């Protein structure tokens, strides 16, 4: 359910793009992210810092898209967000000795410390590569193809990555 909730702004962006075009879709994405944060704040009182980062990035890049009437900025938004996630994972591990992947998933699965460290860096590399792939699609294909990639391609990459990660991790998981 949380996965669908996280996709809420992307799905609305996709639908708005198909009906009204990139500029309306961009405004819808900004509004949907604001609604998403308001809902989380109302329901849980605490908003995840990455959701605030997402709002900042969509507002800055979406705002630039709307003000300058240039869709290049909104196309950069996913890459900036993916690369921000990557930087946060690496800096938290190297600078603060905190493994954020372990902090998020450590209660669900038990893994050796070394594997948590590897997993943290694997996610960081995945986000860098996904950002590069987003730019490749944005600059080499039509806006229509990029919008489809944003919803289906990036989500598909994430699902394939998680399945592959699960297969890799299964040999390290401790029996309960």
From Swiss-Prot:
A Gene Ontology term for the protein's cellular component: plasma membrane
Gene: yciB
Pfam families: IspA
Family as reported in the entry's similarity comment: Belongs to the YciB family.
Keywords from the named record: Cell inner membrane, Cell membrane, Membrane, Transmembrane, Transmembrane helix
Localization per record: Cell inner membrane
Residues passing through the membrane, by range: 24-44, 49-69, 76-96, 121-141, 149-169
Keyword Membrane part of the UniProt annotation: yes
Protein's recorded name: Inner membrane-spanning protein YciB
Organism: Paraburkholderia phymatum (strain DSM 17167 / CIP 108236 / LMG 21445 / STM815)
Job description of the protein: Plays a role in cell envelope biogenesis, maintenance of cell envelope integrity and membrane homeostasis.
Membrane topology label: Multi-pass membrane protein
């Amino acid at each position: 359910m949380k996965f669908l909730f996280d996709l809420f702004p992307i799905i609305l962006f996709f639908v708005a793009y198909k009906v009204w075009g990139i500029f309306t879709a961009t405004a819808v994405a900004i509004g949907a992210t604001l609604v998403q944060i308001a809902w989380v704040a109302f329901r849980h009182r605490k908003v995840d810092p990455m959701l605030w980062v997402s709002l900042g990035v969509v507002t800055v890049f979406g705002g630039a898209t709307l003000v300058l009437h240039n869709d290049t900025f909104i196309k950069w938004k996913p890459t900036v967000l993916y690369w921000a996630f990557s930087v946060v994972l690496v800096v938290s591990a190297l600078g603060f000795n905190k493994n954020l992947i372990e902090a998020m998933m450590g209660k669900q699965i038990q893994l050796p410390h070394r594997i948590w460290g590897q997993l943290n860096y694997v996610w960081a590399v995945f986000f860098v590569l996904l950002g590069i792939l987003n730019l490749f699609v944005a600059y080499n294909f039509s806006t229509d193809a990029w919008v489809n990639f944003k919803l289906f391609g990036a989500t598909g990459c994430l699902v394939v990555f998680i399945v592959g990660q699960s297969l890799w991790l299964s040999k390290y998981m401790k029996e309960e």
